[in-house]
Swiss-Prot record:
This is Trafficking protein particle complex subunit 9. One of its GO terms (biological process) is vesicle tethering. Belongs to the NIBP family. PANTHER family: TRAFFICKING PROTEIN PARTICLE COMPLEX SUBUNIT 9. The gene is Trappc9. Component of the multisubunit TRAPP (transport protein particle) complex, which includes at least TRAPPC2, TRAPPC2L, TRAPPC3, TRAPPC3L, TRAPPC4, TRAPPC5, TRAPPC8, TRAPPC9, TRAPPC10, TRAPPC11 and TRAPPC12. Directly interacts with IKBKB and MAP3K14. Keywords: Cytoplasm, Differentiation, Endoplasmic reticulum, Golgi apparatus, Phosphoprotein.
Length: 1148
């Protein structure tokens, strides 16, 4: 026997071997259709008994193996079933003859045979024959299973007769010597009458009867016969047959202990109509006692039925541990015979299957190791493949997965051995795939993305290389690309630099013919190879969705309740909702993208390769919103470290969009890399809302861009920065061009400004504009342009604390509180030693050369299109950087009374801080020319001011923080009124630049009082004409002059009554006043005037007359009586103007 049956198991010893073969030409499909139906009848209960027969079918069985049928009866072919096609009665004789020829091959051992004929109809088919069955076709053959059952019953009858015949021990009969084929020549010439010979014959026959009993379903009888055989054969040292007896004993015990079988069959081999005893669960108990049943208890029909019904009472079978020991002993006996190599190998296989059931892997591996070294005849390549495959399956059965994979790989390599004319690359590839689990490999790259690497990387890489080569030899380049991609993705950390270069070069060569895709590859056997995305080429460590640029970010119009209010809940705050939505906040981002705008996602990538990595067609993978990804191409330097990469795309619709990953093309392999499959990835969320489309506004100005960027508060960003240099007081126009560069109409525009500089005091409107004409052009369609003008007025403090002119003794008040000179001009150069030496003081008000900076932000809030309907808008900020150089300074300011009580002189010391000649002028005054760094004093005659009072209602007072702030507001309002009336302007002719100068901030409370018109207004009229000192009232000598004094009360309270006396005098212009004018002037009536009490906003008038007797210039001084109510009022309230009267001679 040279062909081992690697599928043998211990329970096969109880089966009857039936060969099913085709006679003539029968299609393989039809043959196996009937063969499968025949195999379905593998177990049959014997009528009127509790025994069962088990059948083992084979469609191919070497005839030489049949010669070992006496040694082990399950190897004997006892039944033959042939299948043939016969469509004509003429062919029937020839077909039947072939059937007989086939029977002759196994004729010495056959119990019975059957012939199934398909296609023959007519008289021949209608003749009843016990060994032939006729069927019209392969579809109309319902009785096949019934025929097989009848056939098995006939086999049982023959089997039972042979068992009874061999089991009957007739004294005096000579027992034949059963032999194996190679023993026949060894027994020629032996003494057949010796006691040793007879014991040999008895022992072998007893073992043979045990085999028949086991096949006939009499387990306990078989155990008894095997025990008796062992004793007999052991006494004569018949080792080969002793091994067979021990193996039979082991097989019977295995059948008893493991009713489910050891060969992995699905159904348990049990007696039909019977149940296992309750002690079956304890059959595996170690050390079960062996008690031999008295052979006298045996009958021709087997053991007494009473004992046969409860097998558990019989302790003849071996314990699980003893089974293995007996197997080892039997195999040791087999190993003594070279020609019993197949028997030894199959015994090892059977023992391994038993040990696998007992979960004793280490002992099973010893049997397998022994099987590996059993020398058989020279095996064919196909037999070698079969042997290694079975060894692999057995190692897998006992849990030695890597050992199993090793032999599976050896079998795969054997399929393409050089000695094979036509290498079986497909079989090799299939076997290599089956080895993957044993080497901790799978075809899914996800299994390698988490945790530490499992298995030996070097062996795994070798196996993957072999898969690549085998798939290439199969002519399937797509498979080669898939396996090579898997190798590069999963084994990247274990490849040397040279290996990385070699693998990528090979991959590029393969993908040049067949690019790698993300489509699963389904093999003919149904196995699916999942796609292999290159998540390590490059490695992505961080994914961050970027907000739109500041100028393009959408903002939601705040509702009346505020942004923080939720319309989904009536509660102001609910911690439960906040807790439940924690995970959602981690995924959703707090900014929005806009439909139709280019949106960005930043990836931090790393190139692990030792050479430059070219990544082509890299784009985003999204869901939820229609998204147009704009692919990018990268070139990462070798081992680049973290490298920022920005991927962009345009959402085409609105809704929630989720960034699921990215796609790349590397080395010709297209990859879809999902974020969920990236290990160690940091992301701040991947879901963002896309709102409806909004217009895009682009701003350009007439000013140059600024190199300095403004840093506004609250995280705002400036889209564009412009700068301009102005002199203090100068105004410049900024032309702003608005262009709609988007796809939606611009429907709404609001412009606001915000001053960033707070340390400098600004006077007036720094920025001003008018939008009416611009808004009249709205809606501004895409591509259209609109313009408007912004006025920039840099008006800072013009005061300076430096004393640049000599102090003169007069009654004026300076800014610093020192007396000033009279209103004639005095010119002086600035004294260097008077400059402050402390650097901190240099930045204060009054630093003559300090350039001050003003920064402001113009904010353009605009909206339009679908986004405007949904309540969204955009902000575009323009940063304005203004450097203000000093123009003129007012180093001192004071006042001098004028000849009129309603006027005064404002004295200003003006300093030119520029490097150019500068002119200064006030309203109705001539220009004052100042050279560079020159200071001059200018006097401006001004009418006194009737300042409007700041309201003092309780609500108005509450608007200010305190009374001091209230007073400051009043003072600023008065300063603004004074500046507007003075209208002081400067001009630099050489630069053609001009501006205004303001006295706001210069005037203290004392000066304001001097400039303020008294609440009591005194008017003196001479002959009905208002009179003031500057203009002399003319009259004729001898004519009475009517004098009228009028009082207007503008104070909030009533005043008076008053008594006034008119005192005339003459001024000799030498400091001498002559009051003795009784002979020159005569009063018509009294020289004292009386005024009654005047109510608020009321008026009172008193009249008198004078008579001038001589010509000349006379002055009338109107005084209050000392006991008058005037003492209760401030002096400025009771200051009456002087009257200048010129008496002329009578005209002829």
């Amino acid at each position: 026997m040279s062909v081992p049956d690697y599928m043998q198991c211990a329970e096969d010893h109880q089966t009857l071997l039936v060969v099913v073969q085709a006679v003539g030409i029968v299609s393989e499909e039809n043959f196996f259709r009937i063969y499968k139906r025949i195999c379905s009848v593998s177990q049959l209960s014997v009528r009127d008994t509790q025994r069962a027969l088990f059948i083992r079918y084979r469609h191919h069985y070497p005839p030489e193996n049949n010669e070992w049928g006496d040694f082990q009866t399950h190897r004997k072919v006892v039944g033959l079933i042939t299948i043939t096609d016969c469509f004509s009665p003429k062919d029937w004789p020839q077909t039947f003859e072939k059937f007989h020829v086939q029977k002759e091959i196994y004729g010495s051992t056959l119990y019975d045979s059957r012939l199934f004929v398909f296609g023959l109809q007519g008289d021949v088919a209608e003749q009843p024959r016990p060994d032939v069955a006729f069927y019209p076709n392969y579809d109309d053959c319902d009785s096949v299973e019934k025929r097989i059952e009848d056939f098995i019953e006939s086999l049982f009858i023959v089997l039972e007769s042979k068992r009874l015949d061999r089991a009957t021990d007739k004294s005096g009969d000579k027992i034949p010597l059963l032999c194996v084929p190679f023993e026949k020549k060894d027994f020629v010439g032996l003494d057949t009458d010796s006691r040793h010979y007879k014991k040999r014959c008895q022992g072998r026959m007893r073992k043979h009867v045990g085999d028949l009993c086991l096949q006939a379903g009499m387990l306990q009888d078989a155990l008894v016969h095997y025990h008796m055989s062992v004793e007999l054969l052991r006494s004569v040292n018949d080792f080969l047959w002793l091994g067979a007896a021990l193996e039979g004993l082991c097989s019977a015990s295995v059948i008893y202990h493991y009713p489910g079988g050891t060969g992995g069959k699905t159904g348990a081999r049990r007696l039909q109509g019977s149940s296992l005893p309750s002690e079956a669960a304890n059959r595996h108990r170690p050390g079960a006692q062996e008690v031999l049943i008295d052979p006298g208890a045996l009958t021709t029909n087997g053991i007494n039925p009473d004992t046969s019904t409860e097998i558990g009472r019989a302790k003849n079978c071996l314990s699980p541990e003893d089974i293995i020991d007996k197997y080892k002993e039997a195999i040791s006996y087999y190993s003594k015979y070279k020609n019993a190599g197949v028997i030894e190998l199959e015994a090892c296989v059977k023992a391994v299957r038993v040990l696998a059931i007992q979960k004793r892997g280490m002992e099973a591996s010893e049997f397998l190791q022994n099987a590996v070294y059993i020398n058989l005849r020279q095996l064919s390549e196909e037999e070698k493949i079969q042997r290694y495959s079975i060894l692999s399956e057995l190692y897998e059965l006992i849990g030695f997965h890597r050992k199993s994979a090793f032999f599976k790989r050896v079998a795969a390599m054997q399929c393409v051995a050089p000695s094979i004319a036509e290498p079986g690359w497909r079989a090799c590839y299939k076997l290599l795939l089956e080895t993957l689990p044993g080497y901790s490999l799978s075809l899914d790259p996800k299994d390698f993305s988490k945790g530490t690497h499992r298995g030996w990387a070097a062996v795994q890489m070798r196996l993957l290389h072999e898969l690549v080569y085998a798939s290439r030899r199969m002519g399937n380049p797509a498979l080669s690309v898939r396996h090579l991609s898997f190798l590069l993705q999963t084994m990247l950390d274990f490849l040397s630099d040279q290996e990385k270069k070699d693998v990528t070069q090979s991959l590029e060569n393969y993908t040049a013919k067949c690019p790698g895709t993300m489509e699963p590859i389904t093999l003919p056997d149904g196995l699916t190879l999942p796609p292999v995305p290159f998540t390590k080429l490059p490695i992505v460590r961080c994914v961050k969705l970027l907000s739109l640029p500041t100028s393009l970010r959408p903002h939601k119009v705040k509702s009346l309740l505020g942004q923080s209010m939720s319309t989904k809940s009536p509660f102001i705050y609910s911690p439960i909702i906040a807790h439940n939505r924690g995970e959602e906040r981690n995924k959703k981002i707090d900014f929005q993208w806009v439909q139709g705008d280019v949106c960005e996602v930043q990836l931090m990538v790393y190139n692990p390769m030792p050479f430059e990595l070219r990544v082509e067609n890299m784009g985003l993978l999204t869901s939820g919103v229609e998204f147009e990804s704009l692919p990018a191409a990268l070139s990462l330097p070798a081992e680049s470290g973290l490298y920022p990469v920005t991927l962009v795309g345009v959402p085409q619709t609105t809704g929630m969009i989720t960034v699921n990953g990215y796609h790349t093309t590397v080395f010709g392999v297209f990859s879809d890399c999902l974020l969920d499959n990236l290990p160690g990835l940091k992301t701040g969320g991947s879901t963002v809302e896309v709102i409806p489309a909004l217009p895009r506004l682009q701003i350009s100005t007439s000013l140059p861009r600024s190199a300095r960027s403004l840093q506004p508060s609250a995280g705002d960003e400036i889209a564009t920065n412009v700068s301009v240099q102005l002199y203090n007081g100068e105004t410049q126009q900024l032309a702003v061009t608005l262009e709609n560069i988007g796809l939606e109409p611009l429907e709404q525009l609001e412009v606001t400004s915000k001053l960033l500089t707070t340390k400098e005091k600004l006077y007036g409107d720094f920025l001003s504009w008018k939008l009416e004409e611009t808004l009249a052009q709205f809606p501004l369609q895409p591509g259209k342009v609109a313009t408007f003008t912004i006025n920039i007025k840099a008006k800072l403090d013009f005061s300076c604390q430096e004393n640049l002119l000599q102090d003169l003794s007069d009654d004026g008040i300076s800014v610093s509180g020192f007396p000033l000179s009279s209103p004639f001009r005095q010119v002086v150069r600035p004294r260097v030693e008077s400059r402050p030496t402390n650097p901190s003081e240099g930045s204060k008000t009054g630093d003559l050369g300090h350039v001050k900076t003003l920064e402001a932000v113009l904010n353009f809030k605009y909206s339009g299109g679908p986004g405007h309907v949904e309540g969204y808008y955009r902000n575009l900020s323009l940063g304005l950087h203004v450097e203000v150089e000093p123009s003129v300074f007012f180093t001192r300011v004071s006042t001098l009374p004028a000849t009129s009580t309603r006027q005064c002189h404002l004295l200003l010391d003006v300093f030119n801080s520029t490097e150019h000649e500068l002119t200064v002028c006030a309203r109705n005054n001539s220009e004052l020319v100042l050279h560079a760094s020159e200071c001059q004093r200018m006097a401006i005659q001004v009418d006194k001011f009737n300042f409007e009072s700041v309201p003092e209602s309780p609500g108005e007072k509450g608007h200010f923080a305190n009374l001091k702030q209230l007073e400051e507001e009043r003072q600023e309002a008065r300063g603004l009124e004074i500046s507007s009336k003075l209208d002081i302007r400067w001009r630099i002719p050489s630069l053609k630049r001009s501006g205004e100068a303001s006295v706001e901030g210069l005037l203290n409370q004392l000066i304001l009082e001097h400039l303020q018109l008294a609440p009591l207004q005194w008017d003196v009229l001479v002959d009905g004409q208002p009179c003031d000192c500057e203009v002399a009232a003319a009259c004729q000598v001898g004519d009475p002059v009517r004098l009228e004094v009028r009082l207007t009360n503008r104070s909030p309270r009533s005043v008076g009554p008053f008594a006034l006396t008119v005192v005339p005098f003459q001024d000799h212009q030498n400091g001498v006043h002559n009051y003795d004018l009784h002979d020159v002037i005569s009063f018509v009536g009294s020289s004292t005037f009386y005024l009654d009490t005047v109510q608020p906003s009321g008026q009172s008038t008193c009249l008198g007359a004078l008579l001038f007797l001589y010509t000349g210039d006379f002055f009338l001084n109107i005084r209050f009586h000392e006991d008058c109510k005037s003492k209760e009022l401030p002096p400025s309230w009771v200051c009456l103007p002087s009257v200048h009267v010129r008496a002329l001679g009578a005209q002829a």
